Design a protein with these regions (language model features):
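Active-site and adjacent substrate-binding regions of carbohydrate-active enzymes
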Residues: 1-514
């Protein structure tokens, strides 16, 4: 610890989904100028950086995670000048900028993919093309969004791989020019003043090259934490991340502790830190997302203990409850009624008391809930619509499917940020691209700032505490009640200091006396 502590090891990062944050033009879509307009609010909260989900040119099949040009701002979000103004305004306030890099796949509208449709083009090798057997795809891998992961391309007579939507073609990282082009993208944004990168599903980029069918699952074991993934990340880090001083956080799908100990090792050879999602599957009945089940809090505590202890003094965790793909945490593990405020504070305290870099997703700091949509037409998310169509065709009732979506859809976190109780919550002067939550007149920023006992000020205090209490950055982790079904009590210790966090996940009073 003789070296200065990197800013992100005692900092807090705020995730912004720009489309739903603040509209500055009245067209119903949030934009970069809207983010700039709200920087004073973020400065008051006390965050060290903002992470922007993709604002690049995109057909918006998957809300910007289908990138058609990595180095251009989509006109829906504004201009490059708007982006440059945002960076400058944020930096003046001591707020850093983290950009989202979607490097597993591009949009099929990307110039690389358009060129790759010609078998003789040098860009053909930028993507994963394979022959099938007659009408049968190359293997039985499933797309994360439903259906087969291979799409037949009639003009060139081969299938291309898409682990996500059909319009999101997987890049071929085995081909060195692909990696060189992606390094150029990182350099471009570093030149624009970006301070960090969030790498979308980055542990899926190395595929087993014989592409075997999976007799036991959906194929993920053949491309998750794949054979060359550490080599690829070390190359990116050596050539771009380290020379440019970029903080990097990898989104790791279905990963393991052992891999993350290497991805985010303190030596810094690959990434600064990693996201994993195991803790957000404790309400998946039988491991299946599209179900309704009560969370298993004993399992939740076990997962955090495993990662807190396994990464301690070896590697770095990214801590989060919410993001643009997850339902609101106060609806999921807390309470939407009379106990919403204490539940939101409790969940914040538990997470911010751990070792790692906490991430706050927009609206989490005011205790936003799921929106309670009542019709499939209220939803915009491609994954949600695909699930509804697929399951309805299998005979599940629309009411049952809507109940599942109300608890698990990605759109639960994508409703507009409510700034006040007036029209459209102050998000837009026009019709918002997606509906607001039904309780925005009660739960909004103006109301939170006016109430000294609000969730906002609890988050503000936790952010301040992380900067002033080194124990939070460096202390160990001991679960004091690992088998208790509703009490989450843990102890952190460092250099003679002790911190005990005690939280009640139930709606009933519980008694506990620390030893």
């Amino acid at each position: 610890m003789s070296n200065p502590t990197p800013w992100w090891q005692n900092g807090v990062i705020y995730q912004i989904y720009p489309k739903s944050f603040q509209d500055s033009t009245g067209n119903g879509y949030g934009d970069l100028a809207g983010v700039t307009r709200r920087l004073d609010y973020l400065q008051e909260l006390g965050v060290d950086a903002i992470w922007l989900t993709p604002v690049y040119v995109s057909p918006q099949v998957d809300n910007g995670y289908d990138v058609a040009d990595y180095c251009a701002i989509d006109p829906a979000y504004g201009t490059m000048a708007d982006f440059e103004q945002l960076v400058a305004a944020a930096h003046r306030r001591g707020i850093r900028i983290v950009m989202d890099m979607v490097f597993n796949h591009t949009s099929t509208e990307h110039p690389w993919f358009k060129a790759a449709q010609d078998r003789h083009s040098p860009y053909r090798q930028f993507y994963v093309w394979r022959d099938g057997e007659g009408d049968t795809p190359p293997n039985n891998w499933r797309s994360k969004f439903g259906g087969n992961a291979w799409q037949w391309h009639a003009d060139s007579g081969q299938y291309y791989l898409h682990l996500f939507a059909t319009e999101q073609a997987d890049l071929n990282w085995e081909h060195p020019p692909v990696r060189e082009e992606l390094k150029k993208v990182c350099q471009f944004w570093a030149d624009k003043g970006v301070d960090g990168l969030r790498l979308d599903v980055i542990n899926l980029v190395s595929k087993q090259q014989d592409f075997p069918s999976d007799s036991q699952g959906d194929g993920r074991r053949f491309y998750t934490d794949g054979p060359r993934i550490h080599e690829f990340l070390q190359e990116m880090s050596r050539d771009v991340f380290q020379p440019r001083g970029l903080m990097t956080v990898g989104e790791m799908s279905s990963t393991t502790l052992e891999h993350c100990q290497q991805y985010a090792a303190q030596s810094g050879e690959e990434l600064s830190m990693t996201f994993n999602f195991h803790h957000l599957k404790v309400d998946y009945a039988g491991g299946e997302k599209w179900t309704r089940a009560a969370p298993d809090y004993v399992e939740l505590k076990q997962i955090f203990r495993h990662w807190q202890q396994g990464m301690h003094n070896r590697a770095w965790n990214a801590l989060f409850w919410c993001n643009h793909d997850q339902p609101r945490i106060v609806s999921r593990f807390g309470d939407e009624g009379a106990l919403r405020v204490p539940a939101a504070k409790m969940l914040a305290m538990v997470l911010h008391g751990m070792q790692g870099t906490p991430y706050i997703y927009q609206g989490e700091e005011i205790g936003m809930t799921n929106p309670h949509f009542s019709s499939i037409s209220d939803y915009r998310d491609v994954e949600s619509h695909n699930m509804f169509i697929e399951r309805a065709a299998q005979g599940q009732s629309p009411d049952e499917l809507l109940a599942i979506l109300a608890s698990k859809s990605r759109d639960n976190s994508r409703t507009p940020m409510p700034w006040h109780a007036g029209e459209n919550g102050g998000f837009s002067d026009g019709e918002p691209w997606i509906g607001l939550g039904d309780n925005y007149q009660e739960i909004n920023v103006e109301a939170a700032l006016a109430d000294p006992d609000s969730v906002f000020y609890a988050y503000q205090q936790l952010i301040t505490l992380r900067k002033t209490l080194p124990l939070l950055t460096w202390g160990d982790y001991e679960d004091l009640l690992p088998e208790h079904p509703s009490l989450w009590c843990y102890r952190r210790q460092w250099q003679g200091q002790t911190l005990v966090v005690a939280a009640n996940l139930s709606r009933e009073l519980q008694a506990w006396q620390p030893a």
